UniProtKB/Swiss-Prot annotation:
Protein name: 3-isopropylmalate dehydratase large subunit
Pathway terms, separated by semicolons: Amino-acid biosynthesis; L-leucine biosynthesis; L-leucine from 3-methyl-2-oxobutanoate: step 2/4
Originating gene: leuC
GO molecular function: 3-isopropylmalate dehydratase activity; 4 iron, 4 sulfur cluster binding; metal ion binding
NCBIfam families: leuC, PRK05478.1, PRK12466.1
Binding positions ([4Fe-4S] cluster): 349, 410, 413
Organism: Vesicomyosocius okutanii subsp. Calyptogena okutanii (strain HA)
Amino acid sequence: MAKTLYNKLMDAHIIRENISTALIYIDRHLIHEVTSPQAFEGLSIANRKLWRKSTNLAVPDHNVPTTNRSSGVSSISDPISRIQIETLGRNCELFGIDEISMNDTRQGIVHIIGPEQGATFPGMSIVCGDSHTSTHGALGALAFGIGTSEVEHVLATNCLWQSKSKNFNIEVNGSLNQHVSAKDIALYIIGQLGTAGGMGFAIEFSGNTIQNLSIEGRMTLCNMAIEAGARIGMVAVDEKTINYVKDRPLAPSGIKWRKAVKYWRTLHSDKNAHFDKTMHFDAKDIKPQVTWGTSPDMVVATDGYVPNPNNAKNQTEKISWKNALNYMHLNANTKISDIKIDKIFIGSCTNSRIEDLRIAADILKDKKIANNIKLALVVPGSGIIKKQAEEEELDKIFINSGFEWREAGCSMCLAMNADKLEVGERCASTSNRNFEGRQGQGSFTHLVSPAIAASSAIAGYLSEVK
């Protein structure tokens, strides 16, 4: 019987099942400081041990400072942030879990360091107490976010009961327009599908446009599957995938590598596999994108206009658009290029990989950011990416243009650390969510690609690449 990639991965991990749910084995559990404290506390109260220590890998990322860390955790001024990072360290030591600590050169965002260290590879089931765990599906893995109670369950049993998802194939074919990236593909699809269009589905991204993306680009795409309502996003394994994983620290080696590769090459949807839903997109229809509202599906092309609520499809959407415009302090029919920006953020688990930094640096080379830009940040996704960028002298390009070059972390993606927007500030951000107050109370977020973030920094307004 022909199977989809999702069904192959699920079937390989099922321990027990009924019609709608299945008990599945978890191969890899990624841990950070925000969703794990209560889980570890639950284990301690129940006097439970870990089922399999080696399947866990921890890293602090949400609360870490991106400025000077020379004095370690004590340099964190916010007491809650400091306590969470200290608690993660103590719990990892107590339970014998490998932790990439804050001042380790490998430290970074959990969804960056997983693939980077080879902790993520094809065929795995991967969970983390974070909704953007779908990122890892780019490597042909079954990856999804879980809640704190489930974090405890995985620590204790390496198993989870999960509802079975339906299969959704999103196919994109054709050559991308100039300056269009995986981030633009993701935002465009979310704009067409809506933030609930993928609910209950595992999305497989396919088509020659997706095949031509780098692994970094595929990670960006799968990262944002959750913004379309799907907990799972994935791409079939190909030679790019295998070459990406090869020789990474935690990847298989020797005879295990050869056996793994043989299996990995089967991780694709079979020719006649049944999908419950299918959508087709032509790459030539996708322009650089920017969000204008308070949801990732409130998105238009950068050469477009803020939409008019009177043109909404229904009354619910009309009200939603009106509320978004009111919050964002924008007027309908405003030209996108007339929206003035205060700050720029290039980073997050969506767009902080070396490919993203190269794209932005190429646009910023020999240019300066606009005078009205109060702050422009580049925050690499990991210490390894930071080191590579510095070896390529990308940091000098950013600094010379007026950007600040920071240490790795989640940074301004969310207002949980020192990097946040002030009330009334507007940011062009390469992150993944533009909810009310996401980057700081009363702040305004416009989601963009690294290319558009860089060009907007130069223009001082939301801007296409000139």
